[in-house]
Amino acid sequence: MASFSPLLAMALAIFIFSSHSNAQLSSTFYSTTCPNVSAIVRTVVQQALQNDARIGGSLIRLHFHDCFVDGCDGSLLLDNNGTTIVSEKDALPNTNSTRGFDVVDNIKTAVENACPGVVSCVDILALASESSVSLAGGPSWNVLLGRRDRRTANQGGANTSLPSPFENLTNLTQKFTNVGLNVNDLVALSGAHTFGRAQCRTFSPRLFNFSNTGNPDPTLNTTYLATLQQICPQGGSGFTVTNLDPTTPDTFDNNYFSNLQTNRGLLQSDQELFSTSGAPTIAIVNNFSANQTAFFESFVQSMINMGNISPLTGSNGEIRSNCRRPN
């Protein structure tokens, strides 16, 4: 009889634990302890949108940037404390870039007033993402809940694990693979760039000196290029923002994919999905451009997939009373 190696036993244990953790997430997790949590979150997001049209894109980005670093655990929300917490907020992909933390605080306050000590900060991010999408005209879905908050942050992981707007398709695909997501997830989740804004510094190299060639990115539509060069002139502020989707900037629809087909993807990482020769992403972009329902269905599933990345459940982690610091 073949021996059962310790390494195989460990791998099996990890698989069982991982599967068990994901299985513990449920859309009815708070049905008795905080039955109105979804409505509470939606109300605060709706209020925030009245003053800040771009907040929906900002909130979903927080969820994305949280999940890609050690899993969906709310670690991105932790502030520096001068000793044990070196905040992910100060990692290169996040500093002077991620926003919406005040809205998360407002949601947490409202939820704590209704159900003290029950709902995790990471679950608030997941619920706020769904509210942001549906309030912008996108799909609604039953968010799986039951994650708990990590007590530590991983700034180094944020610097290495998060996809960059300057990366090619090979690197983007690898970073998604690293967290258990596939090419369809990559394209579907990139579709969140159908709303929100981006800073000039995230795409200005495409406008004047792409890959140190001294010329603009040849995949950029020339009319769109001229518009972007006016918004982000050489020597201008890198923190000026413009719409990720120039056609319907605050609506969650499939125009993002139509933009890629006409070389109007704002970020290099956007246009790579369509302009990389022979890439499997091209057919997915074409499908989502032609069929908004297909995009919405894939997006919902990919959001669920992303939300399932290594959650802390059971007795692991904690339910923070303040999203900015461990209890």
From Swiss-Prot:
One Pfam family per UniProt: peroxidase
Domain of life: Eukaryota
Alphabetized UniProt keyword annotations: Calcium, Disulfide bond, Glycoprotein, Heme, Hydrogen peroxide, Iron, Metal-binding, Oxidoreductase, Peroxidase, Pyrrolidone carboxylic acid, Secreted, Signal
Signal peptide limits: 1-23
A GO CC term attached to the entry: extracellular region
Disulfide bond sites: 34-115, 67-72, 121-323, 200-232
Glycosylation-annotated residues: 36, 81, 96, 159, 168, 171, 209, 221, 287, 291
Catalytic residues as annotated in Swiss-Prot or TrEMBL: 65
Record: residues binding substrate: 163
Cofactor: binding details: Binds 2 calcium ions per subunit. Binds 1 heme b (iron(II)-protoporphyrin IX) group per subunit.
Annotated compartments: Secreted
Keyword Chloroplast: no
Catalytic activity as recorded in UniProt: 2 a phenolic donor + H2O2 = 2 a phenolic radical donor + 2 H2O
Residues reported in the UniProt entry to bind heme b: 193
Role noted for this protein: Removal of H(2)O(2), oxidation of toxic reductants, biosynthesis and degradation of lignin, suberization, auxin catabolism, response to environmental stresses such as wounding, pathogen attack and oxidative stress. These functions might be dependent on each isozyme/isoform in each plant tissue.
Protein name (record): Peroxidase 15
Source organism of this protein record: Ipomoea batatas
Gene symbol of the encoding locus: pod
